[in-house]
């Protein structure tokens, strides 16, 4: 959803040549980090923990008919509170390493952590530029 936004296209260029191929995946994880980190500002009337409970209830209704890999992912996602823990950059590094471990073709995700760390402030600025606009588009059903 965010890949074609100008701020995201710009941020992809900040990745080194050896990690640029996985930049879209890494950036998606990073946007989730900022969303979790700034949740109370972005959604003051719906605390993150309440949202997590609501989202889990919604997903649980479709889980019985889902693929085993999706079911397995959800077992970890909810029990380990991933959406809450995304605010912690050490957890983001673990997430990227885990993805790389499961998919050898995505091994560059391990090193993409350094790109995130090097450009953290600029990435956060880009998040604040595109997120309100993206949410307005969602509200208008224009995205």
UniProtKB/Swiss-Prot annotation:
Disulfide bonds: none annotated. It comes from the Bacteria. Keywords: Fatty acid biosynthesis, Fatty acid metabolism, Hydrolase, Lipid biosynthesis, Lipid metabolism. It catalyses: holo-[ACP] + H2O = apo-[ACP] + (R)-4'-phosphopantetheine + H(+). It is an enzyme of class 3 (hydrolase). Its EC number is 3.1.4.14. GO terms for biological process: fatty acid biosynthetic process. One of its GO terms (molecular function) is [acyl-carrier-protein] phosphodiesterase activity. Belongs to the AcpH family. Converts holo-ACP to apo-ACP by hydrolytic cleavage of the phosphopantetheine prosthetic group from ACP. This is Putative acyl carrier protein phosphodiesterase. The gene is acpH.
């Amino acid at each position: 959803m965010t890949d074609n936004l100008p701020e995201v296209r710009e941020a992809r260029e900040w990745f080194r040549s050896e990690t640029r191929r996985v930049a879209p995946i890494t950036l998606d994880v990073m946007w989730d980090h900022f969303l979790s980190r700034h949740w109370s500002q972005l959604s003051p009337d719906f605390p993150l923990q309440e949202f997590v409970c609501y989202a889990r209830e919604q997903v649980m209704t479709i889980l019985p008919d889902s693929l085993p890999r999706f079911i397995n992912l959800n077992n970890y996602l909810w029990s380990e509170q991933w959406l809450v823990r995304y605010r912690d950059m050490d957890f983001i590094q673990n997430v990227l390493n885990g993805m790389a471990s499961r998919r050898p073709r995505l091994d560059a995700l391990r090193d993409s952590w350094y790109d995130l760390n090097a450009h953290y402030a600029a990435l956060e600025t880009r998040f604040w530029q595109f997120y309100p606009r993206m949410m307005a588009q969602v509200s208008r059903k224009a995205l």
